[in-house]
């Protein structure tokens, strides 16, 4: 596995692979990798001949009171995980490489509607930052396919819409959330949790799963169901950002007729914001 830091080096390496007829996959990350990231890269290696991963902590997607400065940078450990997972090329640009003209006047990519509400409501500008950096990476690499985790369900929806609307010839693949044995979705931010918080954190997925089970059993009073689960989460020590049931395709509020639903949640355990979701198809 080679590691490059400049767009010029990245494009040269990708061009060599493409000239050899290789199918190219991209997995963008912010580093501090866990086994969920490794699973994405392994899936990419199964679907493509040449796997590119990126590590870039993108300032554009962090709000003023978020953890940009403290987000863990663990490059050496990340390189080892990527190598073991089957990555061929790692791109680790600095901020000046990604935004050479500064961020104040950077052209931005905005995906309306899907970027609003849910995480977009509590993190203004977040998805604009995500869409912008991912579109830049797509232009730099021009992959045949890109793989993202379904844990960030709204982010995946935003990227799918961006690719569709901007006619990018890239296949977007969502991979199921990787979980710890107790159900907690793997996240780089889980490392912020202390021992007691980590023990309580699986209650988030439990509430989501119980919501899905109730709907599958025929429950139609979503408001009462969600209110009871919010109380359950608060009792477990969470401060709730949102817990909602949406149409899985449009992320609009669901109707009784929607066959394809997603239950989405974001909540704080101490100072750590955790997100999770569960996709549900009603027969």
Curated annotation (Swiss-Prot):
EC number: 6.3.2.1
Binding positions (ATP): 30-37, 149-152, 178, 186-189
Functional pathway: Cofactor biosynthesis; (R)-pantothenate biosynthesis; (R)-pantothenate from (R)-pantoate and beta-alanine: step 1/1
Top class in the EC scheme: ligase
Subcellular location: Cytoplasm
GO biological process: pantothenate biosynthetic process
UniProt family annotation: Belongs to the pantothenate synthetase family.
Subunit: Homodimer.
Other remarks on this protein: The reaction proceeds by a bi uni uni bi ping pong mechanism.
Protein name as catalogued: Pantothenate synthetase
Taxonomic classification: Bacteria, Pseudomonadati, Pseudomonadota, Gammaproteobacteria, Pseudomonadales
